[in-house]
């Protein structure tokens, strides 16, 4: 009798433990502030809030965690305090059409559709049914640094791709600068420079950079002609340390790389290594009379229903409106706007080096064409390919 009772107690205890949902965030690019169980299969908490070193920024949107012991369960998650600070003003990222992503292998992702957002209280809720025991959940499709390194390894044998420069981060991660062209063709080619993921958490930019690279290296007839006539320089991941640690927007030193291209005498911190790497490369090019004909900086941190191409207010960039119009042929919801800050990468390149520069910010989630489609990794890659086609049409005019 005693043995039977002990056996029943042991079995009950193990079943109870097995049913407890576990939240894990100790892997690459993962991030969640606090997430506590408040009822069976119900969790409440906050995302990490990252405070900029000068205290005028508070970024919070990125989350990425793993759940275990969830098979055949419905679990709900509530995140509050979803309000930050951007350049001294309020920053709101979440909406009622924000849809996180879920994966059972950390590779293939689907949207979580059961979502709600309380705009007054800044609370975001979502719930989902789990088909397997382990799942990963993220704000948007993650693009970890290791994935980028593996991708680069898979394409670097191409005769058209060359790593011409390699910057380093404070944590000694590589920042490859890629050159893509046909080296056997003419030398006086127009040069295009593209950067992505200055801001960690803007992971769709990494996939769009893959789309650019995949197309330029392909056997497509148009791609072959582009390689003959142009040379592309691409930095797919400008902020590897921030990406690795799952930071929203900033580096682990809480610097916004896009605010660091012009330094003031009163700045308390040194210019980031990530910035100095690319800046020095461009300055060296100009010293050797090698210009850049076009620069594009890719951003994508919000899940909102529009894509914007930002220009500064200088006359030199007004012509780039034509490029945004060409992008409409592929992405009808692209529009252009204006922003000005001398410390921004694109603005600095225009003002200091007279490089025609464009900031392209596209959504990580919802398309605004009225059909309610949500973007996928393939869509991000297609965006990159279509951008190259738009650039070619623009420079050929």
What are the residue ranges of the model-derived segments?
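Extreme N-terminal flexible tails
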Residues: 19-131, 135
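Sec-dependent N-terminal signal peptides
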Residues: 3-13
